[in-house]
Amino acid sequence: MNTIKQSFSTSKLEGYTKQLPSPAPGICLPAGKVVPHTTFEVIEKYNVLDDIIKPLSNQPIFEGPSGVKWFDIKEKENEHREYRIYFIKENSIYSFDTKSKQTRSSQVDARLFSVMVTSKPLFIADIGIGVGMPQMKKILKM
């Protein structure tokens, strides 16, 4: 995970000459903060990763369903190198624990706080962005 964060935060914004939006790509936000569309636009149009990052096992750590509209990755509190991946699909909300490999879901009237349409891998583009997390944690009781 640290390799991914490092690659994303040091990647080049090839061709971008304007002042970076606030928050800039790669900056972690407190839970509940909405990421402005301008930040997503910079990621979509200018972010270039120099390296392909693969898991040590050379296998995907998680295969999600198709049609995922949003997700976020959070490191579990007081636990190092354990992460939970949250995502929304249609009217369901899911969490995937990278240690236990367990997926939990709950039916909800899912509301997206931010929507990003990107040709880049969403896994890379969405690191550390806490959009709508308090509501998700309450629903999943985490």
Curated annotation (Swiss-Prot):
Miscellaneous notes: The WR equivalent of the semaphorin-like protein is split into two ORFs which are likely to be truncated and non-functional. This ORF is the C-terminal one.
Name used for this protein in its record: Semaphorin-like protein VACWR164
Species for this entry: Vaccinia virus (strain Western Reserve) (VACV)
Family: Belongs to the semaphorin family.
Domain annotation Sema: ranges: 1-142
InterPro entries reported for this sequence: Semap_dom (IPR001627), Semap_dom_sf (IPR036352), WD40/YVTN_repeat-like_dom_sf (IPR015943)
Taxon lineage: Viruses, Varidnaviria, Bamfordvirae, Nucleocytoviricota, Pokkesviricetes
